Amino acid sequence: MKILFAVDGSDYTRRALDYLATHDWLRRDNAITVFAVALAVPHRAAAMAGPSLTHAYYHDDAEVALRPVRQAFAADGIQAEFAWEIGHPAEAVARKATRDGFELVVMGSHGHGALANVVLGSVATQVLARCKVPVLLIR
């Protein structure tokens, strides 16, 4: 199975990582891509900083989310690809899942109730609404 593991470096990512580590069916014989999204900086700031500094910022931002997963996977002998994009997290996750033919998206969620999601919104809720493939939310 082709799995997209969406991460943001939060405690919710840590919980999803712990879940993945203890559920062999998610790790065994699956192609896992760990995916982070760097939020776009305002165009004016990017123009002032220049392309190389802006790219370095995006790379460093994504690495904050990817590095702990890369280290945990290496320690557990889990093979995975690591990728990142710039954009809105929910849009980028749903787009990547569809574009690259993933069969499952795994991600952490803070677990707010329905009312909080209506008022506050959440990346997980938006991914559920936008994604065409199954999404496994870990709370």
What residues fall within each predicted segment?
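Absolute protein N-terminus
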Residues: 1-2, 139
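Small/aliphatic-rich secondary-structure junction motif
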Residues: 2-52, 76
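Class I S-adenosyl-L-methionine
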Residues: 21, 63, 67-74
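General small-molecule cofactor/ligand-binding pocket signal
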Residues: 33-35, 81-85, 136
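A short acidic, glycine-rich active-site loop
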Residues: 52-64
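Structural beta-alpha unit
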Residues: 71-105
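Gly/Ser-rich helix-loop-strand patches that form or flank binding pockets
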Residues: 95-139
